[in-house]
Amino acid sequence: MKLVLAHNIGDINHENYSTRSMIYNCPYPIGFDGVYKSVYDNQDVLEGKSGIFFVMGDYVGKDNSFEYPNEVPVLEQYCTWEQIQEMCDKYDFKIGWHTWGHPDLTQVSRHEMVQQITPPFPMDYFAYPYGRYNKVVLDCVQQAGFKEAWSVNQGSMNENDPDYIFKQFRPYL
């Protein structure tokens, strides 16, 4: 399955026509790397779309202050489990796992890796934090029972690049 990542999509409000237009016109399923509350508040943009909401267990209902401290501005709150489930029930979206705390899995012990990769309930889809993985990470993800795992195609991550919002995920398992 081709899946396009809606990266840093914290601003899909009604005034942000550029982002909304990109979502409306995207012909592929969309993966949300973390699900900001603005997605829930402006969920009309999901009508007729499908995809995966990749959640980080420790940050559901919290903000993104954990990510690149002092480098990335705190955007807003992530959705709660209830909000994510409501959108999954209403639209053609699934819940995928993005670890508990979003660590670089290539830099943690195998014990911590297994803890981070293990979701709170069975899920079919996994996204590697920061897009990083190695053989040990691949093995742990496979042993956790995921059917598909995705890594962001890093490419250019310049916010002035028109492809900044959407980066293609690639399945690895």
Segments and roles (model prediction):
Residues 2-91:
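Active-site beta->alpha N-cap acidic-glycine motif
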Residues 49, 91, 101, 145, ...:
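Residues that flank catalytic or metal-binding motifs in active/ligand-binding sites
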Residues 79-115:
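Histidine/lysine/aspartate-rich catalytic loop segments that bind and position anionic ligands
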Residues 58-61, 101-103, 133:
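Short, catalytically relevant binding-site loops at active-site mouths
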Residues 56, 100, 153-154:
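Proline- and acidic/polar-enriched loop/turn elements at helix boundaries
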Residues 1-32, 36-43, 107-173:
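C-terminal active-site subregion of NodB/CE4 polysaccharide deacetylases
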Residues 53, 95-97, 150-151:
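Hydrophobic residues in well-ordered beta-strands that form the structural core
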